[in-house]
Amino acid sequence: VPLRSDPTKPIYFFAYHITITNESDNIIQLMSRYWHITDSNGNVEEVRGPGVVGKQPSLKAGEAFEYTSFCPLPTEFGVMHGVFHMAPVDGDAFEARIKPFKLAIPFSVN
């Protein structure tokens, strides 16, 4: 996010877009999130909290929920991965794992 980033401090804001799709036959609700964020210096930050972007959406079978958020880093690139804690109306709670994805300033990494 160039308008929010300031390389003189340094602070870089990275936007990311997530789509959560309910591929089950049950209604499910996103209860909480966990993010594991690593900058290019190897520093790790862990973020936990209820829902995402202030919401705990419920999804019927086949429905999707999309959101965009951001992650500030002190370096030009990093990586994040995590878990969404989901609760179905009927059944046991489960974790939806988010595979690692890169956060990088365009053209800063080959």
Q: What residues fall within each predicted segment?
A:
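Low-complexity, acidic Ser/Thr/Pro/Gly-rich terminal tails and inter-domain linkers that flank the onset
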Residues: V1-Y12
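Asparagine-centered strand-capping/turn motif at beta-strand->loop junctions
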Residues: T19-S24
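Short, surface-exposed linear segments at secondary-structure transitions and domain or protein termini
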Residues: D39-G42, G54-A64, L103-N110
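Residue-level preference for beta-strand/loop junctions
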Residues: P10-Y12, Q29, E63-F65, G78
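Terminal connector regions
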Residues: P72-N110
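Short acidic, flexible loop segments centered on an aromatic residue
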Residues: N26-E45
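Intrinsically disordered, low-complexity Pro/Gly/Ser/Thr-rich segments with frequent PxxP/GP/PP motifs
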Residues: E45-F77
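Short, solvent-exposed loop/turn segments enriched in Ser/Thr/Gly
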Residues: Y12-H17, H81
